[in-house]
Amino acid sequence: MKASIYLVTVFILLLLLLPTAIPHDYSDALRKSILFFEGQRSGRLPKQQRMAWRRNSALNDGKNLKTDLVGGYYDAGDNVKFHFPMAFTATMLAWSSVDFGRYMSQHDFRHNLVAVKWATDYLLKTVSQLPNRIFVHVGEVQPDHDCWERPEDMDTPRTAFALDAPYPASDLAGEIAAALAAASIAFKQANPKYSAILLNKAVQTFQYADSHRGSYTDNPGIKQAVCPFYCSVNGYKDELLWGAAWLRRATGEDSYLRYLVDNGQAFGESSNYFEFGWDNKVGGVNVLVAKEVLQNNVTAIAAYKDTAEKMMCSFLPETNGPHMSYTPGGLIYKPGSTQLQNTAALSFLLLTYADYLSTSSQQLNCGNLKFQPDSLRRIVKRQVDYVLGDNPMKLSYMIGYGERYPGLIHHRGSSIPSVTVHPAAFGCIAGWNIFSSPNPNPNILIGAVIGGPDVDDRFIGGRTNASETEPTTYINAPFVGVFAYFKSNPNFS
């Protein structure tokens, strides 16, 4: 008897000594991923501002063109406002509300709509002079990057750039149309009047995009101002499909369905379909359009669903190639950009397609193999947990989440003492002394998901390593919907 008790005791002690995975708090991650956007705000901040170390900035934007371009978001760790990636950010935040809002608490859903509206209020300004003019971005990149200044102090030129008709801007206008259309769905119940304004302007903006075909960076002046940061490398045709797809979903009108049918092949819905991000919308177009095929059997656009299926199958190693690549630690890997930018956008598509399969009671068909929607969700779960700390570096790549996350991130406002504790301005050159400091950023940019590790799961860090430590709005935005799903399904495995 004593021997049996002894063995049981030893067994229990051994179990206690075994390493156990600490479950992640997806609710906390969701809340913080939305809060991050308050740290990126430009313009006059509201009384409800929760990221308290930020203050008003860039209150004269647009003045050189005699227009109001105050507001919007800084795209990353600098103080420039690029409208192309900002519009993509708005689209993804709105899509998170539309398809994953049911997984959010009322509190989180409301704050996500606030984040969407901060972007769309500004985007409405960028297309306020259509069909004659569209505003492209605000701030001169080189002078801005030559200085290390918090937004509240910046004294670099705030030149606003615009394109006048007939110069083309199909990619920029197409993405803005998509953002406004997606947001119109998100606000349909909460604010019907605002929803109608967004949809009306989305229709007008898409008409402009389709009437003046070409990329916004085809213009030499804009190319010099924007490139190499946000050049439209992939061209404009994917944004036309993207805008049409969102307008089809927002309106249900057959004219947008015909547009997708007539232009899908010519505009490349079946090419380069492994990509999705601020520049290339092909993967997103196919998944978004596939919803109607899966749920309503709209066979006229079945080609989009077939291409979306090819993309989904590429994530599963059991299928015939081609395949997506993964790091040794399990992170989705694509060469040529910050890794978590790809992880965020592709994870969102995987989870969204899984949702469309589930609601239509269908499986993923990969040749002779069939997969349940949960096969895709497991891939996403691995990505999310990796980002939150289950990775070879044992490091959370979300700032302010968990016990261990990078302290020196490439972000001007976060790295320089706040005006609340140091009212005197930091000049252009003085800021570089702070940039070189080994001390952690004094202002925690809560919820920011940074660039992340390399192909071998290594992370060096430091403010000088912008590809690893700089956050962007378009990394965070897709993660909002992803975190919302796992908040409501925390025990999924």
UniProtKB/Swiss-Prot annotation:
The UniProt GO MF terms for this protein read: cellulase activity
Kindly list the cysteine pairs connected by disulfide bridges: none
Q: Which residues form a coiled coil?
A: none
User: Which residues carry a glycan?
Assistant: N297, N465
The reactions it catalyses are: Endohydrolysis of (1->4)-beta-D-glucosidic linkages in cellulose, lichenin and cereal beta-D-glucans
- Localization: Secreted
Residues crossing the lipid bilayer are none
- Pfam families (UniProt xref): Glyco_hydro_9
EC annotation from Swiss-Prot or TrEMBL: 3.2.1.4
> Could you tell me the keywords of this UniProt record?
Carbohydrate metabolism, Cell wall biogenesis/degradation, Cellulose degradation, Glycoprotein, Glycosidase, Hydrolase, Polysaccharide degradation, Secreted, Signal
Question: From what superkingdom does this record's organism come?
Answer: Eukaryota
Active site, renumbered: D78, H410, E470
**Family annotation (InterPro entries):** 6-hairpin_glycosidase_sf (IPR008928), 6hp_glycosidase-like_sf (IPR012341), Glyco_hydro_9 (IPR001701), Glyco_hydro_9_His_AS (IPR018221)
The signal sequence is 1-23
**GO cellular component terms attached to this protein's record:** extracellular region
> Under which main EC class is this enzyme filed?
hydrolase
Family listed: Belongs to the glycosyl hydrolase 9 (cellulase E) family.
Provide the protein name: Endoglucanase 23
According to its UniProt entry, this protein's organism is Arabidopsis thaliana
